[in-house]
């Protein structure tokens, strides 16, 4: 399915495959602009990925089907339950690849990440592979017009985050916020400026660009 969508229905251009680790475990952190983002990422990484997928909203049948095909761990976007964290950590302990959308919702431009996903990134002590996907916005209109849209998937250099939380609660909250924003800046560096959203003008983005 990933191959059919990414190489037949759309023209997918992938940059940065040299940065993909040879083996897991690691976390793939992706912007979320469209429901087909997981398919494009799975095609680009070319390895099995378990995605954290929203379970707290009504979704279309084809999204449910896609989730079953990709492999997904259901999660509540407003509260990352202990059972979800446990399943995600178990997957990483097995050496699997975990796909996360830090914003936990789709939109036109980048938004602030949810703390639960940031917490998981720290708790797992795994490297994070940032990925930016762009070009799916008008996919339905293009298909109806008989146009095969061009989609860009950019893969950045993997990076690490601190592995321990400070005992002080205020410092812990600040750490979650800072690391979450840092993850988003790595993703923003792979996207055009018009999509930087809440991170527009952030100086870290230029530092993280190739």
Where are the language model's segments positioned?
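Catalytic core of membrane glycerolipid acyltransferases/transacylases, capturing the structured
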Residues: 7-8, 15, 20-79, 87, ...
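A conditional alpha-helix N-cap/helix-loop micro-motif detector
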Residues: 10, 78-82, 110, 169
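Residue-level preference for the first positions of well-ordered beta-strands
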Residues: 25-27, 95-101, 129
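A cross-family acyltransferase "interaction/gating" segment
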Residues: 108-174, 178, 204-207
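Short, basic, glycine/proline-bearing loop/turn elements
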Residues: 1-2, 69-75, 101-105
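Catalytic-site beta-strand/loop segments enriched in glycine and acidic/polar residues
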Residues: 89-118
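N-terminal membrane-anchoring alpha-helices
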Residues: 1-13, 204-207
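Short, highly charged C-terminal tails/helix-capping segments
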Residues: 195-210
């Amino acid at each position: 399915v990933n191959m059919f969508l990414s190489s037949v229905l759309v023209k997918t251009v992938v940059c940065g495959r040299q940065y993909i680790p040879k083996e897991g475990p690691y976390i793939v952190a992706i912007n979320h602009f469209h429901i087909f983002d997981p398919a494009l990422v799975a095609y680009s990484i070319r390895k099995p990925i378990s995605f954290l997928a929203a379970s707290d909203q009504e979704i279309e049948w084809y999204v449910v089907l896609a989730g079953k095909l990709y492999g997904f761990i259901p999660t509540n976007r407003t509260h990352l339950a202990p059972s979800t964290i446990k399943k995600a950590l178990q997957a990483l302990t097995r050496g699997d690849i975990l796909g996360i959308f830090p914003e936990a919702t789709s939109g036109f431009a980048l938004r602030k990440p949810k703390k639960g996903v940031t917490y998981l990134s720290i708790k797992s002590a795994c490297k994070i592979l940032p990925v930016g996907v762009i070009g799916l916005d008008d996919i339905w209109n293009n298909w109806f017009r008989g146009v095969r849209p061009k989609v860009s998937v950019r893969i950045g250099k993997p990076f690490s985050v601190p592995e321990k939380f400070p005992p002080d609660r205020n410092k812990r909250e600040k750490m979650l916020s800072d690391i979450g924003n840092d993850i988003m800046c790595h993703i923003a560096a792979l996207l055009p400026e018009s999509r930087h959203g809440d991170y527009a003008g952030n100086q870290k983005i230029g530092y993280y660009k190739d």
